[in-house]
Amino acid sequence: PPLEEATKEGAKGPANVPPDASGIDLSTLETKNLSLLYFDPVQTYLTPYIARAFENALIFHQKTFNWTPWDRTTLLLKDFGDYGNAAARSSPNNAVLLDVAPLSVSMETFTPGERFFTLTNHELAHVATMDVWNKRDARWRRFLRGKPMPIQEHPESILWNYLATPRNAVPRWYLEGSAVFFETWMAGGLGRAQGAYDEMVFRAKVRDGDKFYSPLGLESEGTAVDFQVGVNDYLYGTRFFSWLGLTYGPKKVVEWLGRDEASKPFYAAQFRQVFNRKLDDAWNAWIGFERDFQKAQLAKLSAYPLTEVTHLSPIGLGSISRGFVDAKTNSLVAAFRYPGTIGFVGTMDLASGKLRKLQEIKGMMLYKVTSLAFEPATRKAYYTEDNYAFRDLMEIDVDTGRKRMLLRDARIGDLVVNPADKTIWGIRHQNGFATIVRIPLPYAGFNQVHTFDYGLTPFDLDISPDGTQIAASMGEIDGKQSVRVWTTESLLSGNGPQEIARLDLPPSTPESFTFTPDGKGLVGTAYYTGVSNVFTFDIATRKYEVVSNASTGFFRPMPQPDGSLLVYEYTGAGLTPSRIVPQKRDDLGTVEFLGARLIKTHPELKEWGVGSPAKIDLDPLITERGKYRPTKRMKLAAAYPIIEGYQGSYSPGYYFHFEDPMQFSQFDATISVSPFNNLPKRERLHVGLKYKTLN
């Protein structure tokens, strides 16, 4: 049967929504607590589940914080990027933005559970911890006619914002750490507070003598010069909240985040009131605990012989894409992203570690940098740009550095070249679905080979040397992860993938599995013991072996002709290209997760599990379905005193702001007077009007 085809410009029509969102046509699903906005018909299938997940999470947060939301939450579904993300706010109104695209779980940096369940629990934790209020806050919100946002034109708005929503004025580690803490225990322990990646980060810091940031240093240096940039807020915040929960108990954590009548508005003052110590003192105590905790884990791992590692680079290189060894130049072809440089496609000499930049990457990712494939015969590499938007497919000559765009906005990643016929295969994300695609020569368009059901998300695609088999890691809706091997013929036939082998290593996510040079097996990594080690998998026998014992973690192994493996070892400075000799291991050390110690010490956290959203009877909760008309939903969102200046004189006045919940239509009115100098009467009254729309 013919395969669905798309042109160089990508698919057209309602399924491909332009990222500028001009002329938006949104449908709505309304309940008492939720206004869910979405694009019909391509996102309609998601709305019942997401609405249930929202109501499910809301019940938990209302009970936990004794919180009544100040206003209804507006939730917007969007598909403006190829990887999922989310955002939340409580000022000027409660709102959540959710991308429908699959999330990147590279190196288990995100929870492999059902994404909307996890994201909704996480984002509503943000809304709750920022919107919590007591009688004092309520008085200010009524006086200010809402929860004013800080705006540049009127610096006084910073004060009004703090008085109305004091818990909006908090550092990001506070927001993300608390949200990950709740996300994990609301899911019964499946989350980053029990994540192997987080453990590895701090284990590597201790092993390598890397610095720990203070709360102030984290928000300045830690999110600017460290390769993980803003993700450090998640990492540090989550560890600190977990330590607080372990040391003082979950109830104290909730008390700190809450806003009862006796609480302090400023988060640090509230911390001292709840824990009877300064925040900085507690932070330092956590760092001392973390060092001792990780030293104990390193000792457990070294009880068994550790794999000897030869670093091929003199420094850690932050994030590195999938790499390929170019035998002609004895170099590693990959994409690199580390502090002080824009991510680039380049090469690293395997003898000296010297880097050669070929081209900078527009729209690089954090951990993956880009999706990269290499064809040594033609000296061409293929990679993606605009990785957080609609991805473009690029071609680059690894000898000259010349590049050209092959497909614009194709939304394709996880690239691999089929050695048999030089077609490029990849995985395309659109409308929440993942599709395996094939790009034939001359790479002017692509064929959609197979679209997986919602909840099935393949990644880390690879093709056997003879082109007859395809392998990919696969995430399922229930959080299970595996590596699957299919015949290429079954995919091309249109009858669906025919599975010939599967590797499960629960509860870890097997990733970066690639075919061995003889095509009979796969080699990749997994946190099977809590540490990311290298595994080999025999396709015929379906048996696996672990061939390394890492103290931090190994990633993206590449078999070499001499039997060694090129791997990326995780260090305090990120990934470092290295060489190891694989050796079968029958015994490995395991590590204790901080989250595991927390739940063992405080089993009451088991009661935080919110269960499946399926238990929410949604139909009786729906109050309306229709279209979102921004102008009809505009209302007064804030009104507060201001001070302006006119010809050297003070001009007291008032600012009024009207908007719809998504801020698609906004109207501002500023009225002030200048009564304190000898101005003509016609110049004493000042009125400024401004209307803004998306267009």
Task: Label each PLM-derived region with a short phrase.
Residues P2-P19, D25-E30, F227-N232, E255-F374, ...:
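Beta/coil-rich, acidic/histidine-enriched accessory regions frequently appended to metallopeptidases
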